[in-house]
């Protein structure tokens, strides 16, 4: 902190030390100055008495620091003699309203001050965080720092110019160091609230408290001030001009050297070095003082060891210089306060030409909200004795702040995208995804751009790209999810088109009337095809369905791409096309199967089945010739229709031939199955054919057997004719070479054998089944033969029973007849047996009944015989056992 000069003796000694030899004119001037000084001393004594009366409660500490709980009262301007007490009070209240809080940034040890709630210590960061009026300034602020000797009144001057509260020295307690380290404060001038200043009060140079470490710390604080400042105030005494050490020429040298160090890589802006010459008595004009200082500055710049790229440069290439003077504060308080007020106007009136902190001196790389972080990095770098690369520090600041802005933007993005994300993750399509995402992206980038635009442009652009990539990565994830769902929805859309077509087509076919189905033209085939779900002109239709599905996908996919991104849905589209082609391929195969089945069923149901039923029912000897004729006609006509229908599927010739051959095989298999089905009633047909030949005459009337009929020959011919059906139904004879093939061959001995030279795939009834059918048939017709023989024998025996036999039967059987009549049980039994016998006789079943009864009787007798033999064996065993038992005692007795 700066200290107030209050001791007259020190001032007089310093002025005397710097006095040149006096000429006569100088002696006269000295007398005049002596009179002025005496008047000033008298005024000072009067003013001091007034100050003592007002400040009786002044603090007892040697110096005041900001860490104290109660803020230090600032140095207020000494009232002029013309001001009344009421005016003084009003002025004090107005200024009190404008006072600004200040905090220590760097302490005496060179460490950045940390927060200490226990001791009430606040940091510059916490202070700035509560100053929205400063944080929102962007680049519209100026940093003003002050350098100069210790106890030269720096803090007092800052308090008067900017209404700050920097602590000042109490000269009555001794001249000691007050400002320790670096203090900062945000200030605005009274006349212009739009002008905002960040004030740096730097520890004075040449202080005895630091001793040998003074130069090192002085260099660090000077470097720190130069790195941050727009205006650098050099506070110096007028009587020190012309000296090297007292005039702080070494400090200027440090400033020049550090400037070259800071801006070796990049020149940013000029710095205004404002020389404030204190205690100017007016003897030496300001122009002469300015000329002396500029001469020293030029020589100092020339003597500097500059880097190669700065050889030949002038100090004006890096700095602007301004000079002003202030009279002695104690000896000329009225003039001092007046000139301070004028100087204050130069800091507040931005419209005036004499305005000091012009915009061109501002650092446009450090916005207000990033100032603390930048200053923190700068000091840490300086403190660690590393070379300070100011452009790099600004880039580091931009990195730090831009990272914060990126996270803020991502938070905004996450909040805005949440509804869309939830919608997509629930498996739904987000309409206008690309447009909505672009709007959210732009909003998120605007959240970043607005505060970031004030920082290092290249860094901002890099971080903006990082932010854009992060957001686009999140959006790409949702886009991929959208594409997956769109792929599924497109397949659903594709299936809906198919269902809609098939439903409408089937409905129209079912309502078209049955009369059209009786037509033999192509329309009947189309209607029949539609009724079973066959799609006409499949290739044209499938291409249209695929085109509509792809168009649906592309419309939604194009709406899902974020404008400006390099996204593409080509891979998704290719996958969709593959899936649709696969679905269409499956549908095509299904349609071909349906068409094949339709043509097969149509061939059988409408053409072959009625004819086959009729032919197999009659089963003529030329059955297979007729079947082959009808089969070939149906195959030829339907094969032509099948080929015409296959044109709609755009198949290659190989595939068409494959389907036609399969169609032929299916027809042949179907015919074989149909014959097999009809062969299930082979026994009935054989019986029917046998009866037609054996029991019916040439006039197709029931046969009356006569004595001259050769029953055996007729029976054999009828049986052989019926047994031909077995061979007829046992083998498929569609090929020309099979027309004369006999599978169940009859031998001369009336037996049969298997033809092993035939194609086994054409066998309908296996040989064993043929033999079994033949054997069963012969058993069933045996009774017919026996009955015919019985009838013929009855006719051969003459005119029936003789009359005497009837008379003899009546005489001899009269008693039995009476006993039967008298017994109801015997009468009922006789009636039942007689009725059964009469029915059997009339039905011609008497012979089979006798044969069957004979078999039962023989079986019964055999069983009885077995039982009798078994009983005899048991008796013989018992007899033998008894004999053995009788012989055993005899042997014992012997």
Curated annotation (Swiss-Prot):
GTP binds at residues 148-155. Residues 21-60 form a coiled coil. Its main location: endoplasmic reticulum. GO terms for cellular component: endoplasmic reticulum membrane; pathogen-containing vacuole membrane; symbiont-containing vacuole. Residues 1-97 are annotated as: Disordered. It is found in: Endoplasmic reticulum membrane. Residues 49-65 have a biased composition (Acidic residues). It comes from the Eukaryota. Residues 822-824 are lumenal. Keywords: Coiled coil, Endoplasmic reticulum, GTP-binding, Hydrolase, Membrane, Nucleotide-binding, Transmembrane, Transmembrane helix. Residues 138-361 form the GB1/RHD3-type G domain. Probable GTP-binding protein that may be involved in cell development. This is Protein SEY1 homolog. It comes from Dictyostelium discoideum.
């Amino acid at each position: 902190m700066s200290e107030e000069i209050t001791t007259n003796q020190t001032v007089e000694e310093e002025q005397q030390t710097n006095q040149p030899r006096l000429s006569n004119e100088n002696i006269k001037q000295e007398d005049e100055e002596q009179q002025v000084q005496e008047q000033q001393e008298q005024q000072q004594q009067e003013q001091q008495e007034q100050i003592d009366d007002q400040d009786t409660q002044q603090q007892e500490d040697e110096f005041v620091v900001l860490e104290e709980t109660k803020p230090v009262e600032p140095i207020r301007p000494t009232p002029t003699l013309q001001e009344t007490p009421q005016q003084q009070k009003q002025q004090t209240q107005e200024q009190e309203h404008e006072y600004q809080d200040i905090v220590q940034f760097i302490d005496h040890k060179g460490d950045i001050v940390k927060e200490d709630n226990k001791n009430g210590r606040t940091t510059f960061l916490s202070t700035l965080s509560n100053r929205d009026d400063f944080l929102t300034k962007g680049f519209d602020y100026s940093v003003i720092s002050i350098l100069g000797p210790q106890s030269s009144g720096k803090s007092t001057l800052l308090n008067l110019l900017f209404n700050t509260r920097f602590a000042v020295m109490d000269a009555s307690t001794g001249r000691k160091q007050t400002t320790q380290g670096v203090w900062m404060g945000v200030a605005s001038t009274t006349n212009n609230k739009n002008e905002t200043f960040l004030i740096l009060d730097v520890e004075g140079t040449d202080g005895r408290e630091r001793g040998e470490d003074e130069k090192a710390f002085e260099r660090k604080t000077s470097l720190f001030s130069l790195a941050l400042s727009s205006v650098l105030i050099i506070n110096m005494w007028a009587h020190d001009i012309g000296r090297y050490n007292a005039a702080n020429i070494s400090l200027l040298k440090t400033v020049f050297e550090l400037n070259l160090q800071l801006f070796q890589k990049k020149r940013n802006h000029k710095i205004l070095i404002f020389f404030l010459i204190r205690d100017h008595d007016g003897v030496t004009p300001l122009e002469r003082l300015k000329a002396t200082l500029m001469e020293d500055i030029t020589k100092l710049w020339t003597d500097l060891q500059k880097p190669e790229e700065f050889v030949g440069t002038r100090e004006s290439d890096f700095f602007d210089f301004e000079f002003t003077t202030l009279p002695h504060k104690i000896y000329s308080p009225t003039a001092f306060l007046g000139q301070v007020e004028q100087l204050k106007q130069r800091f507040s009136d931005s419209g005036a030409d004499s305005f000091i902190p012009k915009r061109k001196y501002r650092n446009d790389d450090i916005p207000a909200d990033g100032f603390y972080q930048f200053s923190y990095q700068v000091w840490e770098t300086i403190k660690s004795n590393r070379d300070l690369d100011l452009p790099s520090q600004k880039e580091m600041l931009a990195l730090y702040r831009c990272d914060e802005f990126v996270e803020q933007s991502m938070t905004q993005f996450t909040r805005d995208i949440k509804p869309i994300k939830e919608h997509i993750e629930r498996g739904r399509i987000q309409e206008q995804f690309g447009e909505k995402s672009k709007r959210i992206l732009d909003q998120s980038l605007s959240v970043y751009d607005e505060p970031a635009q004030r920082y290092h442009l290249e860094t901002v652009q890099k971080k903006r790209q990082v932010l854009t990539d992060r957001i686009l990565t999140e959006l790409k994830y949702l886009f991929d999810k959208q594409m997956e769902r769109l792929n599924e929805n497109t397949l659903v859309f594709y299936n809906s088109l198919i269902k809609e077509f098939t439903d409408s087509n089937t409905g129209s076919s079912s309502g078209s009337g049955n009369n059209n189905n009786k037509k033999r033209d192509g329309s009947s085939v189309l209607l029949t095809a539609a009724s079973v779900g066959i799609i006409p002109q499949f290739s044209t239709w499938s291409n249209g369905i695929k085109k509509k599905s792809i168009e649906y996908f592309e419309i939604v996919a194009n709406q899902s791409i974020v404008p400006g991104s390099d996204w593409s849905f080509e891979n998704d589209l290719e996958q969709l096309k593959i899936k649709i082609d696969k679905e269409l391929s499956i549908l095509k195969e299904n349609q071909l199967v349906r068409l094949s089945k339709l043509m097969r069923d149509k061939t059988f149901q409408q053409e072959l089945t009625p004819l086959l039923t009729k032919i197999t029912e009659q089963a003529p000897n030329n059955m297979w010739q007729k079947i082959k004729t009808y089969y070939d006609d149906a195959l030829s006509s339907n094969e032509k229709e099948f080929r015409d229908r296959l044109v709609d599927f755009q198949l290659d010739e190989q595939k068409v031939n494959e389907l036609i051959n399969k169609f032929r095989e299916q027809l042949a298999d179907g015919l074989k199955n149909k014959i097999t089905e009809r062969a299930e009633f082979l026994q009935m047909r054989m019986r029917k054919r046998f009866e037609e030949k054996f029991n019916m005459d040439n006039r197709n009337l029931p046969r009356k057997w006569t004595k001259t009929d050769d029953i055996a020959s007729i029976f054999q011919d009828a049986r052989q004719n019926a047994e031909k059906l077995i061979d007829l139904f046992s083998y498929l004879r569609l090929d020309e070479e099979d027309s004369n093939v006999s599978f169940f061959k009859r031998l001369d001995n009336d037996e049969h054998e298997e033809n092993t030279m035939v194609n086994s795939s054409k066998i309908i009834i296996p040989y064993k089944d043929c033999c079994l059918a033949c054997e069963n048939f012969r058993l069933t017709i045996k009774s017919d033969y026996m009955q015919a023989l019985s009838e013929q024998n009855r006719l051969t025996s003459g005119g029936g029973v003789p009359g005497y036999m009837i008379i003899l039967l009546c005489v001899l059987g009269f008693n039995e007849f009476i006993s039967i009549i008298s017994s109801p049980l015997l009468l009922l039994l006789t009636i039942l047996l007689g009725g059964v016998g009469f029915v059997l006789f009339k039905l011609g079943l008497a012979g089979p009944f006798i044969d069957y009864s004979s078999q039962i009787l023989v079986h019964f007798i055999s069983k009885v015989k077995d039982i009798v033999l078994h009983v005899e064996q048991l008796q013989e065993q018992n007899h033998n056992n008894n004999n053995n038992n009788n012989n055993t005692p005899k042997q014992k007795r012997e």
